[in-house]
């Protein structure tokens, strides 16, 4: 299925989901039952359900039907991780997960663009690298919060989906350890809060410029700008994109916990370093 159409269909299902499910839990999302849909590969969805099964963030699930597609709704909370994150001075944005289906679509986009490796900066509970692994990409997550790293490893061991988890600060780790070719780097932070993180990572990558063969960055943008936002171009990332020498390959808007109750979704910008 064409990925832009898939993303739009996911947004339509999300809107129906929010109108059908009356819940006070901010962490809530759905996954279609694998055998009763034709949107995603059956095996991928079965694996994605195991991610939620072994993820202690989610403590409630129930069945519902969206556009004649049987689905499972998963609800939970991240308060314990918000409290835990206060231990770290260099956390610029609290953990709030990307939707599982959105993560799957993003990895499908990355694969369609020809990337073979992913590095997720601020990998949270590991859903992006989980999806990367089940789609055959070499997947590495960098997360400063040890509790979230422990959760990622538990999910990996329980589901038998393998990926690498690095517990560390993205501004101080050694980037020479990574395979910096055919690699897409995800920055899981909104424009205003992710600026320091992004420029810090960029300074490290500049040291290995000769190795950056087909390397890109995926940025989480915003359709809505705050009154005092420093950058109101290119979904909040215009200056960083220009300073970094990046070109935009694709922008796709997908549901996330950040925009759950808003009319517009979260735009994800897939970019590539210019030669």
Regions of interest found by a model, annotated:
Residues 2-113, 153-179:
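S-adenosyl-L-methionine
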Residues 127-137:
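Conserved SAM-binding loop of SAM-dependent methyltransferases across substrates and taxa
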Residues 138-143:
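Conserved SAM-binding motif I beta-strand of class I
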Residues 149-150:
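Short alpha-helix immediately C-terminal to the canonical SAM-binding loop
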Residues 182-198:
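A short SAM/SAH-binding and catalytic strip from SAM-dependent methyltransferases
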Residues 196-265:
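C-terminal substrate-binding/active-site "lid" region of AdoMet-derived donor-dependent transferases
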């Amino acid at each position: 299925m064409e990925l832009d159409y898939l993303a739009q269909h996911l947004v339509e299902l999300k809107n129906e989901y929010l109108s059908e499910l009356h819940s006070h839990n901010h962490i809530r999302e759905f996954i279609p039952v694998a055998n009763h849909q034709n949107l995603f590969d059956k095996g991928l969805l079965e694996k994605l359900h195991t991610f939620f099964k072994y993820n202690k963030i989610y403590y409630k699930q129930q069945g519902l039907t969206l556009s004649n597609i049987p689905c499972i709704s998963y609800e939970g909370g991240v308060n314990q991780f918000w409290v835990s994150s206060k231990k770290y001075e260099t956390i610029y944005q609290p953990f709030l997960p990307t939707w599982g289906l959105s993560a799957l679509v993003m990895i499908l986009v990355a694969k369609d663009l020809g990337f073979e490796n992913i590095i997720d900066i601020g990998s949270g509970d590991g859903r992006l690298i989980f999806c990367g692994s089940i789609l055959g990409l070499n997947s590495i997550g960098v997360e400063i919060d040890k509790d979230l790293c422990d959760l990622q490893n538990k999910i990996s061991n329980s589901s038998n989906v393998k990926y690498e988890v690095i517990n560390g600060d993205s501004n101080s780790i050694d980037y020479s350890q990574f395979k910096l070719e055919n690699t897409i780097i995800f920055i899981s932070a909104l424009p205003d809060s992710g600026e320091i993180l992004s420029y810090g990572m960029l300074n490290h990558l500049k040291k290995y410029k000769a190795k950056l063969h087909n390397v890109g960055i995926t940025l989480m943008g915003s359709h809505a700008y705050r009154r005092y936002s420093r950058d109101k171009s290119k979904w909040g990332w215009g200056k960083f994109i220009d300073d970094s020498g990046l070109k935009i390959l694709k922008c796709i808007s997908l549901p996330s916990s950040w925009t759950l109750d808003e009319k517009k979704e979260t735009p994800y910008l897939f970019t590539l370093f210019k030669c």
